[in-house]
């Protein structure tokens, strides 16, 4: 593919997220490109929206139509927190088999990066409340 000779990333972001796309473009190595689609939900509660993003993935994927994706990336850590590691791993494995391409979530990507860097302890500061 002319504009993505090394790979085309399908990036799924939450419906109102304004940061993932510019950050992804800034970090993207030469030879790769990405296309973005939105994860959407009509749920009023945040937790239900985050779960809807995962449960309704198939309809979100329709936005990519027949784009020749090399990898699918779900850029939503909140969904990972609610699924938990075991369910997330099963979900990823099922979608990889179905799509025939690697699938990665933001949560798994962060965990892999920390492991690769040898991080054993991490302090976390968050603007979110306990809910």
Placement of each model-derived feature along the sequence:
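Residue-level preference for short coil/turn positions at secondary-structure junctions
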Residues: 4-7, 30, 68, 99, ...
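Gly/Ser/Thr-rich loops at beta-strand to alpha-helix junctions
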Residues: 13-18, 76-84, 127-131
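Short gly/ser-rich anion-binding loops that grip negatively charged ligand groups
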Residues: 43, 47-54, 78-85, 100, ...
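Short, hinge-like loop/turn segments at secondary-structure boundaries
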Residues: 51-54, 90-91, 121-122
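Glycine/small-residue-rich loop that forms an oxyanion/phosphate-binding "nest" at active or ligand-binding sites
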Residues: 61-108
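Conserved beta-alpha
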Residues: 95-131
